[in-house]
């Protein structure tokens, strides 16, 4: 590709370098090699304009900067654009050029990882070569890689989509985080459909209000999806109505799912210990589904996934039958084991108020004894959610143990105190390993334990150091000790 091939995205007309070969796209000056186009992005911690000279020294073909950036005196062309992040995403899409032919994205506060994984599984069972991209990484035929970002940066994303397409993947589902949408990471992805799960308090360290957070989510529907594309929206959330209105205003084909859904209507559900039996109406036909996952929220996630699969061509009967073979996403109400007396221990990623409320409420119907929870809140993040989560835990669980969960640069005792202020009767055990072992030791027949916060993650960040720590490993170790 030559620089002139990015015309329409970048102002390359008349540039001396227009006929030179582009060898790459980057927003990290350390990755610049001769022929790479460098994008100077303004970030929260650093401004890419400060690294433009370094990029030029490393051989950048051109530097792309915003109109407000002071980038001058470089020995390479400086291309000025209104929105450097948008230009980066669109340039990356054009540079890498290919993606799976059917792409869907799902947004919401909770459930994105599960919906992306479930949609992939439905497609797989329908016989399609499918992939999912999100918080737990990339899963595709012959590929299972862990990742740390919900929505990868545009260069990594479009490179990945090219690799998946080259490997024969034709269907792909991905998570669309509010950060990713706001920072234009998904722009340039050709989406066939979009999904919405729910909205609750999250990322208040990034978004000034919940309304601003919701507006960021809506970019999926009012900006990224083409007119007429399916928008599969869970209908039973307080934020469903404004999301439906926005999608309709954008000219999308709104398909609602859930108890109040029109496209897939949940008529009845019966909870069992590790599974649920549901009746779902679709196109006037009633389907009985035996979902091998616990929790109301998993029914909701499964319906959004089925809606995405059906709206992109999977037959209704095949999609709903596939729900009976779903496997939960790693760290999402993940049954790690049971005690000798049969008490189950789950690990869940719930680190937000709504997610904690959902997971605790979901195990109550099949718990004959006590619901117990071990959780904490992260440091250097939304401080306002700490007492909210403390209140939720004490309201919905019978035994609450407050512990540490990535305190980062904050004093751990201060974080715990903020939670405990709204959690009368909660037990404080700062050491997360000890907290898990103590909780497992307290279990009796009929009890259920949730270890919340980390899910699939395998680290505990204290200060600037991340130490290896796995809730799964600690639960298994505690269960072995008690069984000995």
Swiss-Prot record:
Main location as per UniProt: cytoplasm
Subcellular location per the Swiss-Prot or TrEMBL entry: Cytoplasm
Gene Ontology biological-process annotations: cell division; cell wall organization; peptidoglycan biosynthetic process; regulation of cell shape
Positions that bind ATP: 108-114
Cofactor: Mg(2+)
Leader sequence residues: none
Domain of life, source organism: Bacteria
Record: residues binding UDP-N-acetyl-alpha-D-muramoyl-L-alanyl-D-glutamate: 29, 150-151, 177, 183, 185
InterPro entries: Mur-like_cat_sf, Mur_ligase_C, Mur_ligase_C_dom_sf, Mur_ligase_cen, Mur_ligase_N, MurE/MurF_N, UDP-N-AcMur-Glu-dNH2Pim_ligase
Pfam families noted in UniProt: Mur_ligase, Mur_ligase_C, Mur_ligase_M
Gene3D superfamilies associated with the record: Mur ligase, C-terminal domain, Mur-like, catalytic domain, MurE/MurF, N-terminal domain
Annotated meso-2,6-diaminopimelate binding sites: 381, 405-408, 453, 457
Family note: Belongs to the MurCDEF family. MurE subfamily.
Function statement: Catalyzes the addition of meso-diaminopimelic acid to the nucleotide precursor UDP-N-acetylmuramoyl-L-alanyl-D-glutamate (UMAG) in the biosynthesis of bacterial cell-wall peptidoglycan.
Name assigned to this protein: UDP-N-acetylmuramoyl-L-alanyl-D-glutamate--2,6-diaminopimelate ligase
């Amino acid at each position: 590709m030559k620089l002139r091939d990015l015309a329409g995205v970048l102002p390359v007309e008349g540039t001396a370098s227009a006929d030179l070969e582009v060898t790459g796209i980057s927003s990290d000056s350390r990755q610049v090699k001769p022929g790479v186009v460098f994008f100077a992005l303004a970030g929260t911690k650093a401004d890419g304009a400060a690294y433009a000279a370094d990029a030029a020294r490393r051989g950048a073909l051109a530097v792309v900067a915003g109109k407000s950036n002071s980038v001058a005196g470089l020995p390479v062309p400086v291309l000025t654009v209104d929105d450097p992040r948008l230009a980066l995403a669109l340039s990356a899409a054009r540079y890498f050029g290919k993606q799976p032919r059917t792409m869907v994205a799902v947004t919401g506060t909770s459930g994105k990882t599960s919906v992306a994984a479930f949609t992939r599984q439905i497609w797989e069972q329908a016989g399609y070569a499918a992939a999912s991209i999100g918080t737990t990484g990339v899963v595709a035929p012959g590929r299972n890689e862990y990742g740390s970002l919900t929505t990868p940066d545009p260069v990594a994303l479009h490179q990945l989509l090219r690799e998946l397409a080259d490997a024969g993947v034709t269907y792909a589902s991905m998570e669309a985080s509010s950060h990713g949408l706001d920072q234009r990471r998904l722009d340039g992805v050709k989406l066939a459909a979009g999904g919405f799960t729910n909205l609750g308090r999250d990322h208040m360290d990034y978004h000034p209000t919940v309304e601003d957070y919701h507006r960021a989510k809506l970019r999926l529907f009012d900006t990224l999806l083409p007119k007429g594309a399916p928008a599969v929206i869970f209908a039973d959330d307080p934020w469903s109505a404004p999301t439906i209105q926005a999608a309709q205003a954008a000219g999308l084909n709104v398909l609602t799912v859930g108890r109040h859904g029109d496209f897939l209507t949940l008529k009845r559900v019966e909870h069992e210990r590790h599974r649920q039996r549901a009746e779902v109406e679709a196109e006037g036909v009633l389907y009985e589904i035996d979902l091998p996952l616990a929790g109301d929220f998993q029914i909701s996630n499964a319906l959004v996934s089925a809606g995405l699969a059906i709206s992109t061509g999977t037959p209704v009967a095949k999609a709903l039958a596939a729900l009976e073979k779903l496997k939960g996403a790693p760290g999402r109400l993940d049954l790690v084991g049971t005690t000798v007396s049969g008490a189950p221990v789950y690990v869940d990623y719930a680190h937000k108020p709504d997610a904690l409320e959902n997971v605790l409420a979901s195990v109550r119907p099949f718990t004959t004894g006590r619901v117990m929870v071990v959780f904490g809140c992260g440091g250097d993040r939304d401080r306002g959610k700490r007492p909210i989560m403390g209140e939720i835990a004490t309201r919905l669980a019978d035994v609450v143990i407050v512990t540490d969960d990535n305190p980062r640069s904050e004093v751990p005792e201060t974080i715990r105190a903020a939670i405990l202020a709204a959690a009368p009767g909660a037990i404080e055990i700062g050491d997360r390993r000890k907290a898990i072992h103590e909780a497992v030791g307290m279990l009796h027949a009929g009890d259920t334990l949730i270890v919340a916060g980390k899910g699939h993650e395998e680290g505990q960040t204290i200060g600037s150091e991340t130490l290896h720590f796995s809730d799964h490993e600690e639960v298994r170790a505690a269960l072995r000790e008690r069984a000995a």
